[in-house]
């Protein structure tokens, strides 16, 4: 059988390509894909303990069986945080009118925090908590010129949407919006925005903190940091054990 393999972040650099077509015997599993690349590309072996695997945009274990035509994504640890760009709403990170119920968006245009906050707030809210992740000008003493974000886009949007839904169930909040920007970002620009509306501030703060912490560990988005003396993919923590194959 034949499967399509996708590489992201540092794994894309190690492989020297963004994707591959891999021939496997019938009955093969995710483990067979990992073993193949550990042999073909030795540096992959050092990353196996930290990466996650998605099959058809869902996290998968090592024993997950594959079938012909599957899309297998090899995901290095994430380092941060699909909008449909139609008019100002989408460009600012909101699905148009929010009538579709979508609470998560991935965009390439600047994020308009004021507009998104205005769309979220309602008269019966007692608090609106806003978190902006901003591009800073240095990392561990190295001067940063700019950042470049990439994502496994559709899966990332789905994961962000799932986080929003989970937050609505687990915290006493009324509404939430998550937006992450991709592409080149300059110093001071907003890379990720979370807005939480609630009756009381404590629930809003708790939900916002949980959302950004979980997004940064589980949503497949990576950033490359460009310095005066070179560029590197930002190191992320290993995926949670329940996600890793």
Model-derived segments and their meaning:
Residues 4-6, 14, 67, 71-77, ...:
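N-terminal, polar/charged subdomain of small-to-medium soluble alpha/beta proteins
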Residues 60-61, 199-203:
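Glycine-/small-residue-rich active-site loops that bind phosphorylated ligands and cofactors
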Residues 1-86, 96:
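Ubiquitin-like/PB1-type beta-grasp interaction modules and other compact soluble beta-rich domains
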Residues 29-32, 202-206:
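Short, conserved charged micro-motifs
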């Amino acid at each position: 059988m034949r499967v399509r393999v996708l590489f992201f972040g540092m794994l894309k650099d190690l492989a020297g390509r963004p994707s591959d077509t891999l021939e496997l015997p019938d009955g093969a599993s995710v483990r067979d894909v990992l073993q193949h690349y550990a042999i073909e590309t030795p540096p992959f072996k050092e990353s196996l303990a930290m990466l996650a695997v998605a099959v058809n945009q869902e996290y998968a274990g090592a024993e997950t069986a594959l079938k012909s035509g599957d899309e297998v994504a090899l995901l290095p640890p994430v380092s941060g945080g699909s909008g449909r760009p139609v008019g100002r709403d989408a460009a600012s990170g909101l699905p148009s009118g929010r009538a579709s119920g979508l609470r998560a968006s991935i965009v390439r245009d600047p994020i308009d925090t004021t507009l998104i906050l205005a769309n979220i707030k309602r008269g019966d809210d007692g608090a609106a908590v806003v978190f902006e992740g901003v591009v800073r000008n240095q990392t561990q003493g190295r001067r940063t010129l700019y950042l470049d974000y990439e994502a496994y886009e559709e899966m990332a949007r789905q994961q962000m949407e799932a986080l929003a839904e989970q937050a609505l169930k687990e915290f006493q909040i009324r509404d939430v919006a998550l937006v992450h920007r991709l592409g080149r970002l300059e110093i001071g620009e907003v890379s990720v925005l979370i807005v939480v509306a609630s009756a009381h501030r404590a629930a809003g703060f708790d939900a916002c903190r949980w959302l950004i912490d979980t997004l940064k560990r589980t949503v497949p988005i990576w950033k490359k940091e460009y310095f005066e003396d070179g560029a590197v993919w930002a190191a992320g923590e290993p995926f949670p054990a329940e996600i890793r194959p």
